[in-house]
Amino acid sequence: MRRSLSQSPGRVFYGWWIVTIGCVQDAVKGGLFNTGFTLYFLPVLTELNLSRAATSLPFSLSRLEAALGAPFVGYLIDRFDVRVMLVAGTLLAGLGLILLSLTHSYLLFLLVFIGPLSFGFQAGFNQATLAVVAHWFRRKRGLAMAIVQTGQAIGGVVIFPLVALAVLNLGWRMAAVLSGLVVLMLLPLVLLIRGSPESMGLLPDGERSSGAEPYPTAHGLTPARSDAREFTTREALRTPTFWLLAAFHGLRNVPYAGVTVHLVPLLIWKGLDEPAAAFYVGLTALATVVIRPFTGWLGDRQSKQTIGAVGVLLGAAGLVVLAYGDGAWWALVLFAVLFSFGDGVNSVTWALVGDVFGRAHFATIRGWISMFQSFASMPAAVYTGWVYDRTQSYTQALIVFVICYGPAALVLWLIPHPTRPAPLEVAASRALSAS
């Protein structure tokens, strides 16, 4: 019997509601954690009497924690109800921020930062929501992921200035408490997320009908037959494409990790005061709000590899402007726009992972790539701080990051699409026959 998997005419496809929730999540994470923690850098450095390298260490260790945990978290997301991970991660991140405000030693600060705080944001935010979006969209995957990750930039525009006001007027400890309460307010929203369209009797992209029943996969998800040719994690790991994608994401993320933690100190080094530096951080985020959805939309229509390669080269140009510009407003605006291209294509290249390897094991495969990405970028923030401590300048670090962008573009450009294995349903039937 043929079953129609459809939604009522005129109703918004539920996948777009999930994208909206994911965007809100990313806005909170981006404004309070990814971008927001650059505001904590100097106050923590001063209060705990640390060097810049030591202050950078928690950020680098959090990437080590992310590297070690990413494949496991990805497996859990693929294996169990994603809402379990979303709720657990949100609770850990919110409580972690509150606990951070209670630390009065460097050791405790380290333990809280790399423990509940970083793990919560890893497990319950970006990794989980992008996996869900990969299941809900196929033709519009690039745009959907771009909108979700644009939330980080929106957080930089809307939430980051509020964090700046809180840190400057209330102190970093009270800012951390308020941030934790905001994170906990996300709990009702994440409960509305569903793991796949098939779980609600729908199809990816809101397609109106299907000529055949969906089939269950090993992990209880139900991709449509048109999306049936999927890589398992083991099959993906055996392809050169996987390793090239891992190399690209590692190289691309080194400059991002090294620059964003130090962005406010970098801009102060260029001659700005703290309020002006916070303004330009917000401007960088605003540029990403425009650039990321545009590159996502373009990636669904043109080569994702070409768009990603061009984007990281523009990011490299932005770092050259920052390194050798004189701190004039036009140079900082140009840096904000160009560097945003290097970050903005991230959504396109994660969508490429889904295009190449399919939906069923996306979270686990992405987790493995994230592991290598995190290992590669782990030393970046400490290296940036070490360079400044030694030379009283960030120029040497910025040039190294420019060099990282070049091979990243080349690797992405050359990545081949692997030959996909037999469909899962065929493999399953063969295994059944063999037994």
Predicted regions and their residues:
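Cytoplasmic helix-loop-helix junction between adjacent transmembrane helices
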Residues: 114-150, 358
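Helix-to-loop junctions at the C-terminal end of transmembrane segments
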Residues: 69-81, 291-303, 388-389
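Helix-loop-helix hairpin linking two adjacent transmembrane segments in secondary transporters
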Residues: 152-200
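C-terminal transmembrane helical hairpin of 12-TM major facilitator-type secondary transporters
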Residues: 256, 276, 282-352
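C-terminal ends and interior cores of transmembrane alpha-helices
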Residues: 91-104, 314-326
